[in-house]
Amino acid sequence: MPRYKLTVEYDGASFVGWQRQKNGLSVQEVIETALLAINGAPVGIRGAGRTDAGVHASAQVAHADLAREWRPDVLRDALNAHMRPALVAVVAAEPVPETFDARFSAIRRHYLYRIINRRAPLTFEAGRAWLVKRRLDARAMHEAAQVLTGRHDFSTFRAAECQAASPIRTLERLDVQAVGDLIEIRASARSFLHHQVRSMVGSLEMVGSGKWSAGDLRAALEACDRRRCGMVAPAAGLYLTGVDYPEEGEEKGAQPFFGE
C-alpha cells in the first residue's frame, strides 16, 4: 500500500486535541473521516505530535497508507474538500517510503508560543495568543531561557500524567523575541515532554514580570519537582510549526513525542 506524508494546518480551538477521544471531535478524526471517503476503507493515521485541546499547528505531519496511488495535489485537494467546514487543511501531500513514520522518524520538532503583552483585550488574536497585561521584559526572559537549553532532567516542566519513560530531554533552542506588543517564544528539540513547552513559557513569564530571576528558574529546573514550576501557559498561544526528518544517511529519530 502506498504511503503518503501529509502536512497539516489546523485551528486547535475547534478540537479536543490531535488524538481521537470520546469526549469530542479531534483533528485525527476529521482527517481519518476524509480518508475513508476517498479511500473506500478505513485508514488510520499517525501524527508527529499529539497536540492538546486548543493547541494549533501550521505544520503538523502525519502519514497514511492508502489503497492506491494518488497524484499529490489531487490527494491534497480531495482531502480538503471532504474536511470542510472543519478548520483543518492539508497543505501538502507527498509519497514516502513505507519505512517513513511521521512520529518515530522525526529528528526535531519546532514550537512557537505567542504572547500579546498589552492592557487591551484581544479581538483578532482571541484564542490564538496568551494575553498578559503586566509588562514583560522579553530580554530578561530570553537570557533566562538559556538556562533551560541543553540536556537536562525536565521533571519540573512535565505534566503529572506525562507518559514518557524518562524526563531527560535535550532542548536545542529556546529563544524569546519581542516585536511591539507581540512576544514570540520558539523552542526546538528532538522530542518534548507533555506540557513541557507551556510549562517553560509559564515560568519564563514569571521572569519577565520580575517575580523570578534567572537563578530562580535554574533552581526550579534543578529541583526536578513539578511543584517548583510556574503556571502552565494557556494552550491558545501554542503552535506546532515544523517537524524535521533525516536526509538520506542520517540517523532516524528514536524518541517518541508525547506532547507540548
UniProtKB/Swiss-Prot annotation:
<feature type="binding site">
    <location>
        <position position="111"/>
    </location>
    <ligand>
        <name>substrate</name>
    </ligand>
</feature>
<dbReference type="InterPro" id="IPR020095">
    <property type="entry name" value="PsdUridine_synth_TruA_C"/>
</dbReference>
<comment type="subunit">
    <text>Homodimer.</text>
</comment>
<feature type="active site" description="Nucleophile">
    <location>
        <position position="52"/>
    </location>
</feature>
<dbReference type="InterPro" id="IPR020097">
    <property type="entry name" value="PsdUridine_synth_TruA_a/b_dom"/>
</dbReference>
<dbReference type="GO" id="GO:0160147">
    <property type="term" value="F:tRNA pseudouridine(38-40) synthase activity"/>
</dbReference>
<dbReference type="InterPro" id="IPR020094">
    <property type="entry name" value="TruA/RsuA/RluB/E/F_N"/>
</dbReference>
<comment type="function">
    <text>Formation of pseudouridine at positions 38, 39 and 40 in the anticodon stem and loop of transfer RNAs.</text>
</comment>
<protein>
    <recommendedName>
        <fullName>tRNA pseudouridine synthase A</fullName>
        <ecNumber>5.4.99.12</ecNumber>
    </recommendedName>
</protein>
<comment type="similarity">
    <text>Belongs to the tRNA pseudouridine synthase TruA family.</text>
</comment>
<dbReference type="GO" id="GO:0003723">
    <property type="term" value="F:RNA binding"/>
</dbReference>
<dbReference type="InterPro" id="IPR001406">
    <property type="entry name" value="PsdUridine_synth_TruA"/>
</dbReference>
<dbReference type="InterPro" id="IPR020103">
    <property type="entry name" value="PsdUridine_synth_cat_dom_sf"/>
</dbReference>
<dbReference type="Pfam" id="PF01416">
    <property type="entry name" value="PseudoU_synth_1"/>
</dbReference>
<keyword id="KW-0413">Isomerase</keyword>
<dbReference type="GO" id="GO:0031119">
    <property type="term" value="P:tRNA pseudouridine synthesis"/>
</dbReference>
<keyword id="KW-0819">tRNA processing</keyword>
